[in-house]
Amino acid sequence: MKILFVHPNMPGQYKHLARIMGADPKNQVVFITLPKPKVQIPGVHKVEYTASREPDPGSHRYLIPTERAIYRGQEAWRVCKKLKDAGFVPDVIVGHFGWGEGLYLKDVYPHSPMLGFMEFFYSAYNSDATFYEKRDPTPDECARIRTKNMFHLMNLTYCDWGITPTFFQLEQHPKEFYPKISVLHDGVDTEMVTPKADAAVTLPNGSVLTAKDEVVTYVSRNFEPYRGFLTFMRAAEIILKERPNCHIVIVGGDGVSYGRKHPSGRPYFDVMMDEVKLDKRRFHRFGLLPYDKMLDVMRISRAH
């Protein structure tokens, strides 16, 4: 079977699937992505691309995401055209097209079915736009968000089928597309993600926690409102007051992956540390951890 994976941040959601497909010598697996020199998957041929340019600074700001998606889509088209000229025609195209890479693949491979990862469809109402600010969106925000969906609608139209991890994510999409989207969770590698009775975590202060301790954990790539960090920190204050033996361990970075930076420019972690009153002897923070270390944090956790 010939399989084409598409994701700008290889392997994205396809870490396990690409590995399994690549391990079968009967398969020919290609993965197109932005330059990722350190990422290699045995049996998978990685093909890198770079966007030819950035959006024009003079473009209407509503159109910036769409313009950027078009440039990425053009480069993905060029890469796939070279693959096709070399004889590679996939039996299936599997990708997360939320950045534009899938926009023109049907023009290269009109007969190859496309399976798209439908992560999110934006809405100004009852969704993510202002949920933690407790206010109505402005008319400008409504227009910007509606326009941002332009190329996502193209993806929904051109994909033969879509998958999304949760019913919440499905319900963000227009109802007319529900029949072509399956709710399918990313899954868990149950051979790797397992309990470990002797798991232990050495904290930044040098002390050690194990599964015998009362531990609550929070793990996120970045500490930000979109990932529930503000809510968690306010809950942490209550937990530490009501559970005198409890330790809280958090893992994550200070960047912003979704939404906006704090108006002050400070990391949300610093802002929340000023707001809440925590027993710092029982509140422990790690930055980003290697995967095996992060698993040990989860293994000692009573509640996450």
In which residue ranges do the predicted regions lie?
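Nucleotide-activated donor-binding/catalytic signature segment of Leloir-type glycosyltransferases, i.e.
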Residues: 252, 256, 261-296
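Short N-terminal targeting/anchoring amphipathic segment
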Residues: 81-99, 105, 113-115
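Conserved nucleotide-sugar phosphate-binding/catalytic loop shared by glycosyltransferases and other
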Residues: 38-64
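Acceptor-binding helix/loop patch of EC 2.4 sugar-transfer enzymes
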Residues: 53-63, 111-150, 191-196, 200-202, ...
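Carbohydrate-associated surface elements
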Residues: 168, 187
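Conserved donor-binding/catalytic core segment of Leloir-type glycosyltransferases
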Residues: 202-227, 233-238, 248-249
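N-terminal subdomain of nucleotide-sugar transferases
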Residues: 1-45, 163
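Acidic donor-binding loop of glycosyltransferase active sites
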Residues: 160, 299-304
